[in-house]
Each structure stands twice: as structure tokens, then as C-alpha cells.
């Protein structure tokens, strides 16, 4: 898949100009990426996927690229101007094989609505074929399909678009993820808090969200005179807790954590399963500290973040670390930015972590470190983030009493290791292709009695497993054993216990694991102990199998 990233896509330009030649379609923006291009069209007509593909023919056009003093590039062709998003194209590269992948509605603003055509292009036909085959493979493991099959979540019509309902099986996965993060937070000295979902708009005006984030906020009035807003972020509420009492330099760092549910009113056309929703839960954390504490805190956060990612199998070359520096528009002094950036760099170097510098891509309120992960389908996802913030402490006039009795402004660090629990769950479902590690699996063991008369033995086995906190159910249906085994596999159950008359008489079990591994005559206690250890260690592979052989 790496070779695809080296192909610069001029296909988007060519495609947009083809659309212009159709007469009634007006491209307004072209986006060019590593593999994909998109064209936003202002059209009074409905464009179907088949019609779009008809326009996707390679032609040569005489166009001009006009760059203004801000670096924005416009494509000019036959008097038409089209905004170019993604940089100046290499006119020596001409992908000849491209495919239109999808058509969707794009909302650049509340007042505008465009048709977005998404495509991909390559210089070689084999590259395109390989890519389309890969895309088909990826679609088989779409988390929405897996979620429906495993009965994890749903998006009912009665709920607004982008609002998910987690079913019992899905909530088990979420709770396991949260329990693990609670352990991590406890090990770092966090104190868990709980904050309200609704606040006066005054809070969001102080924080700046009202000015910069209003379009994505849910705002409403009560008593015809007071405006309230549902939180899009947890940080302002954590700040209110910090401000609730006088803080001393000896108290710092103060670490708050929360599994906070936030709401962001994304455009309907941008919603996508659990990956893009309007309400989601963050494993949020905020640290209030002195400037001289930044480096040590960042080192702790980075080590723990890498430890967490490794538990899920993301390590080595499957993790990328990015350092984003001060953008042109920012707040804070040069001294503060230099001190914070130097602290991040020192922390990275002392931990011997390779990283890429993304110049001027930091937040306006401080530098940040992001962690990208690569899944089993070779896709990269931006996941964990650590952000230094000078802005909110200034806006809220946060203080601590220093050793000399003077009042000082603390620095704030935002961190989220999962990012969004819901989004990370979607990534894991696709990464593991529905076959989650045992510790995350909603059902960890399924008992399959061969005949009805063995059910009592099956019930006693379930009781034994439940005593040891193992999630278990039993399928004693009328279908054949082979069909029940297949159903358990489709349900993502990692271990099956098959019991017949012989197993009951001997007080043993036959254990079947993923990969068609079957071990007969296993002592029940031995199986339980091996499974408990596998779950406790959060093993990715079925380590209990090796202990049973």
C-alpha cells in the first residue's frame, strides 16, 4: 500500500474540467490528496454515481494556475475559476487510471450545500486494480456491518442522525475500555470527576467556544431570556472545578479525568458510523501545572500513551508521533512557546522517541503531540493527543499561590489517549475484523452441549465461569453442532466449550479456539485458570491455548 502514497493526483483537476464541459455542472473546489481527489459541485441537478463515472475520462486541458499573495491557488479554465485545496499540482504527472468512488452531500457552511464527488487515480492500471481490490476487502470489515452482526449498536430513525445507541454487547466493550483507562489514570495520579452536560452560554463565551465553535454547538433558550449550551468539550467544566478553591504551588500538578460525553453538531453528510457522530465519549484528562513541570508531565503521558497503544497491538512502525509547532496566529508569549516546545522536544528525545515536526500546525493556544496508528488494513488513524494550553488559563484567570506568596498563572495540558471511545471502538472492530481479544469480547466463552440431556452440566460450567468473572452464554439450540460452532465464530466468541456424555462423565471439557484449534479432555479448573490469566494480562492472542496443550 505504501506505493499509493507516492502518486500525486492530478486526476482531480482533469475530472473537474470534464464536469465543466458538461455544461450545467459548476465545480467550485477541488481537493487533492495522497490518493484521493474530490470535486465539490454547485449543481441544480441530481448527479448519480453512474453519471459521474461517465465524466471521468482522461483528457488534456489548457488551464492556468493563479496564486494570490496568501498562497491560495485558483484553477482558471475557459473563464471559470475553481478553488484548489491541497497545493500546486505537478504538471509532469498525469494519472490515466482513476475511479469515482462515491457521491455525497457536503456542507461548507450552514447556508451552502454542494455535491461532493470522491475519486482516486493512479498512473498504472495495476495500481488501480490492486487498490479497488483492497477497498473491497476493507468494506467487508466495515464496523457498521460488524456492529450490526454482533448486536453492538444501532442508529434508529427515531434518534437524530449521528446519535448512537449502544446495546448490551456494545456497552460491555465500552466498559472494558473505560476500566482499563481508569487503571491507567489511577497509575498517573488522576482524580476522576463528573461534570454536567449543560451550561450557561456565559461559560462558552469565556472559553472562546461561543465565538469559534458556535456552528457546532447545541444552543437553546429557557425562560425566554437565558441561553444555554450543551458541552462540545469538557475542559471548561474542569477549569471550574480547579477554580472552586485556592490552589498552592505544592498542589500542582492537579490531574482531572472524566469519561465525558460531548456533543458536536456535525453536518449530516459528514456523519459516518461511529467514526463521525454527533455525541460521543472522550477519555478526557486535564492537568494544571507549573511551567517547570511540563517536561516531566509530558514524559509520563507519552510513556503511558505508548503503553496503552501497545496493549491493543499498536507499536513499533505502526505508531507515528508528530510534534506540531506554533502557528502564525497564536496566543502566549515567545518565551512561553519556546519553553513549552523545548520541553516537548526534550521529553521526546529523552524517551528516544522518533517524531516528525509539523511546522505551524499546533493549536493557537499551544504546541501539541499527536499519535497516529496503523491498523491491520494498512490505514493510518490519528488517535491520541497531548496539547499544551496557555489560552484557557488566561481566559479564566486561573491562579496558584507560589512559594513567595505571589499569584502565578498555571499551564494547562489536555490529553486524550483513546480520543473518542466510540471512534476507537470502531477502529478496533475493523482492525481485529470483528474478532476482538478475549478481554474485550462481549461473550468470552460459549457452552455448546451436544444433546439436551447435557444442559445441566453446561449450566454448572457457566456458573463456574461466572464465579471467575468470565462472560459466558450457552447455545443449546436445535441446530446441528457444526452450525452452532459457525454461529459462534460469526459472533466473534473466542472460546467454545463443547460437552457431551463423555465430558460430563469425566468432569472435563473439549475446548475449541479460533483458528479451528480443538483440545479434548481438558480439566475445567485448568481451563478457567488459563483463561483468567489471559484476560487479566489483556493478551492479544489466545495464550490460554498454549497452557492447555
From Swiss-Prot:
Function of this protein?
Catalyzes the attachment of threonine to tRNA(Thr) in a two-step reaction: L-threonine is first activated by ATP to form Thr-AMP and then transferred to the acceptor end of tRNA(Thr). Also activates L-serine and transfers it to tRNA(Thr) but cannot deacylate incorrectly charged amino acid; unlike most archaea the editing function is found in a freestanding protein.
User: So which cofactors does this thing need?
Assistant: Zn(2+)
Q: How does it assemble?
A: Homodimer. Probably interacts with its editing subunit.
Task: Give TM segment ranges.
Answer: none
Region described as Catalytic: spans on this chain: 142-437
**A single GO molecular function term of this UniProt record:** metal ion binding
Subcellular localization is given as: Cytoplasm
UniProt record similarity statement: Belongs to the class-II aminoacyl-tRNA synthetase family.
For the biological process aspect of GO, one term held by this record is: threonyl-tRNA aminoacylation
Enzyme Commission number(s) of this protein = 6.1.1.3
- Which CDD domains does its entry note? ThrRS_anticodon, ThrRS_core
UniProt cross-references to Pfam families, sorted A to Z: HGTP_anticodon, tRNA-synt_2b
This protein's encoding gene? thrS-cat
Comment on bound cofactor? Binds 1 zinc ion per subunit.
Q: Where does Zn(2+) bind?
A: 235, 286, 414
Q: Which InterPro entries match?
A: aa-tRNA-synt_IIb, aa-tRNA-synth_II, aa-tRNA-synth_II/BPL/LPL, Anticodon-bd, Anticodon-bd_dom_sf, Thr-tRNA-ligase_IIa, Thr/Ala-tRNA-synth_IIc_edit, ThrRS_anticodon
According to the UniProt record, what class of enzyme is this? Answer: ligase
The cellular component terms of Gene Ontology attached to this UniProt record, alphabetical and capped at eight, are:
cytoplasm
Q: What is this protein called?
A: Threonine--tRNA ligase catalytic subunit
| Keywords linked to the UniProt accession | Aminoacyl-tRNA synthetase, ATP-binding, Cytoplasm, Ligase, Metal-binding, Nucleotide-binding, Protein biosynthesis, RNA-binding, tRNA-binding, Zinc
Question: Which reactions is this enzyme annotated as catalysing?
Answer: tRNA(Thr) + L-threonine + ATP = L-threonyl-tRNA(Thr) + AMP + diphosphate + H(+)
On the tree of life, the source organism's domain of life is Archaea
